[in-house]
Structure formats: structure tokens, C-alpha cells
Amino acid sequence: MEKRQVKITGIISEYNPFHEGHRYQIRKAREITGADAVVVVMNGDFVQRGECAVVDKYVRTKMALLGGADYVFELPARYGISSAADFAYGGILALESLGCVDAVCFGCEAPEDIDTMADIFWNCQREEEGIMQMKGYAAQGLSYPAARQRFLQEKTGWSEEKCRERMQPGNILGAEYRQAIRLLGSSMRCEPILREGMGYHQVTPEKENDWKYMSATAIRAQMENGFEQVKGMPEEALQAWKEAGYSMKTEDFWPVLALALRLRKDKLVSYKDVSEDLAAVFSREILQVADYESFIHACKTKNITMARVKRAILQVLFEVKAEERETRMPYLRMLGRRKDACPLPLGNSETPVIGRLAKEEERLSGSDKEKLAQDIFAADIYHMAVAQKTGLPQKNEYKQSMVIVG
């Protein structure tokens, strides 16, 4: 009797924090694909919009496992604090490097238009005609997101309103996942799931379903008034956050961010998203402003978005430089798993899977080990800031065990 092939489905996420919409997505992903295991690739302690996570990656891993995920792997920092395109590429590369993932599921606002958007984004990013047109928009002073929306409208004939609606974070990431799969020549399927409830940036509920599926943005805003005000999270996830006992903000990291910007002022342009114009702004404003919020607002310009400013600051701190894209993930760090999870068939994978750092870091060498050191440094900075803010003992990456649930 032929042995049935194990079905593994991937999700790329941040869980900042984990909410009911995330639990719904995991359940739908399992249902749509018939998955034996759902594997999550999750940001570490800093997220794609250039901010810190509200709580560390171990707590968020526990939330995800309690919410239905079977395995959680860490997305390396060099991808996690990059553009949507690089974030998506890193996530897909991680799943592909496991050698056993059949499909990637993601939430989006318009599943029916993801293929069209992916083709058009490919054109504007990788074909000469599209690249030249985008340069023309940039010369007119348009930011990259605004230029891409204009390009989308011209190529599809959609109305300005429809294009604006389609340029939502879930749709953009979905299109980028498609492109990453194409770039890697992967056979992984894309399975878009319609986003339910609040929009990505929405803070105030407007319809009944919004109360059930609140956005992470809304939950973070609720947290301003304490845990008692938080709605929209599974009880187990909220309890894990309460037990952690803290919620971090990016301004908590301002002293170390400001120090990095000053110390590295002569080599700012070597970092990934720091153009000569942005480097000049950083060098000027770091001498004039005294707090994080004032600094990022002073650095935002007509054609440089706030998200890019915030990402660039973190890239300076963690020394993330512009490099050729990897075609293999040099390592994958497993943050946690369920006890009863279906074993992953990793026989086709050439990527070392690292569990406990103290035991397995030595499996890497050279530049691969340096890349892992970058992730460890990011975690150390986060743990240090938590300890300074709360008085809690500082976590040590080398003493952290995998999170096991179930």
C-alpha cells in the first residue's frame, strides 16, 4: 500500500499580537489545503513596518501554537525589517528551504485580484518598460507606493478608488508572495483567504464583524489603556501576554537607535534602505531632535514614507546591508512546536534547522554564522530594553529553550 504524502501548509506572519483573525486564518488554511501540519514563519522581535514587536518572539510563538499552529520558525531580521517585497521573499524562501511545504496561505482584501497585481508588480519591478515608467513617477516626486498605485491604475484601467482599495497591505503581500514563488521557481501553491473584520490599519470598529476580528493595530491601541481593555484576542493568547507582563514601543529603543545613527553617520548609505538623500536627513536631524517620534516625523518627506524611515533606522542599528538575494536560507531557527504535531519530512532540505542556540550554533560557519549573529544581536537589544523598562530579568538567547505546547 502506497504511503500517503504528508501535506504541509505555510503561513508568513508577525502576530503583533496574535488575534482572532490569525486563529481563523490557521483554521481556514488547514481546511482549504487538508494540511497535516501548519508551519508559521514569523518575525523575531522587530517587525516589517520598522517597529518593535509589542512582546517578544517566544511569547508570540506560544500564542501561535495555542492558536493552532504546529511549528513556528523565525524569519531572519535581514528580511523581517525590509520592504514588503523582501519580507515576502524571505518568508517564501524559508518555507521553500524546508523542502516539504506544498502551499502558502495568506489573508488579503481581494483574493480575486492577487494574480493581476502580481503580474503588474513584476512588470514595474523587473521589466525595462515598467522600471523606466516607475523612475518617471519618482522624478515627479511620487513615493514608491504612490508610483506603484499609479502604475497599477494605468495597466488595469481600474478606477483610482479601486486601485487605492487594492493597495492594501494584505493584497500587496499576496502579490509579493506570488512574485517570490516565481523568482525561486517554486512549485508551492498560493491559497489566498479573504480577510474578515477590520482593515489592517483600522482602529475603530465600524460593523458587527469588526468586533469579532479586530486588527492588530486596534489591539495595540487598546493596550494603551491596559490589558483589561484588550478585545479581539483568543483568551489563551491574551493570558500569555499578561503573564509576560509588558508591552513594548519603539520609542523605548530610542537611546540605542540614536547612538547607532550617530556612531555610523559616515557609512549610512551602506545600509539597505538608506539612500543618499535619507542619509543626509538622518545626519542633520539626529543633531536637532531629542526623541523618537520627533525624529521620524522630521525625516519623512514627500517621496520617503514613514515606514521606510523606520525600517532604515533599524537597518542602521542591526547593520542590514543591501546584498544579492539568497537562493537558499543558510539556517532556520525553530522557535517552537506542538507536542502532537505531525513530524516534518525534512529529508529534501539542505538547510540546518536550529533549535537551542547553545547546542547547535556551531553547525554554521563563516558568513552564515555572521547572519545568525545579526538575529541574536537584535534579540539581545530587545531583551535589554525590556529589562530596562520593566525591571524583569534580561533573557539570554543562549539559554532560551524552544516553546513546546500541548
Task: Locate the predicted segments by residue.
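Class I S-adenosyl-L-methionine
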Residues: R30, T61-L65, Q179-R182, R220
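Non-catalytic positions within long, well-ordered alpha-helices that form the structural scaffold/packing
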Residues: R30-E31, L65, I92, E96-S97
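Active-site cores that bind ATP or allylic diphosphates and position pyrophosphate for catalysis
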Residues: E74-G406
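Acidic, Ser/Thr-rich peripheral helices and adjacent loops at domain boundaries
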Residues: V59-T61, P345-L346
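A glycine-rich helix N-cap at a beta->alpha junction
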Residues: T61-P76
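N-terminal catalytic cores of NTP/NDP-binding nucleotidyl/phosphoryl-transfer enzymes
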Residues: M1-R60
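Receiver (REC) domain switch/active-site residues of two-component response regulators
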Residues: D36, D70, D102
